[in-house]
Amino acid sequence: VGIGDGWSEVLYKDKSCFIRSEYLTTTEPGSEEATVTAQGAEADAQGAPVSNGRIVAIDAGHQAKGNPDKEPVGPGSSTMKAKVASGTEGVSTKLPEYELTLSVSKKLKRILEERGYQVVMIRESNDVNLSNAERAEIANKSGASIFVRIHGNSLDNTTVNGTLSMCQTATNPYNGGLHAASYSLSKKITDSVCAATGFKNRGVQET
């Protein structure tokens, strides 16, 4: 029912599972080759995920207590901003953003690991004190090829809803060279989330 990065999502015995695409075949059921392939698929579906060698760093935005101390917005910058904020809260649910982002991040971690990714969590509890610069440093040192930050924006205007992604501009002095790849990934994430949930697609904001 789906395929990507060498893995396929298949329906097997009324269950959805992920297997390496190399195990799939168009051989007619009942043949000896089809039997061997099915056995391999069952073993893969029941066994531990096979690593695909890729690392993803996930940052659950904010934390229980903000840190108003200042730090540069980028290496060597004279522009300063608060190290980290505690975030907002749901207009209706009153759920703190830092709790929501950690919950979503843990679910994303599980899904990615099931698909063979190695996941580095920037934080795994709400009671931490990690500045934005420290979070970026952890991600950089992890060797991750993808760094995803999870946030949940909030407005007093309850008519505003949907999902958006943010990425840097092409003229960003620190990582503008990654703009094209970052924009492409951001768009794919937003499009996929909205397709799966029915949320309004608010696109990619370059900032």
Give the ranges of each region predicted by the language model.
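Conserved beta-strand/loop element in small beta-rich adapter and peptidoglycan-binding domains
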Residues: 1-5, 40
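Solvent-exposed coil/turn segments that connect beta secondary-structure elements
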Residues: 3, 13-15, 22-24, 59-63, ...
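Boundary regions of SH3-family modules and the immediately adjacent low-complexity/disordered segments
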Residues: 11-45
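Extracytoplasmic/secreted cell-surface and envelope-processing proteins
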Residues: 18, 66-68, 128-132, 155-160, ...
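Conserved acidic residues
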Residues: 145
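Short catalytic/ligand-gating loop segments at beta-alpha or beta-beta junctions
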Residues: 195-207
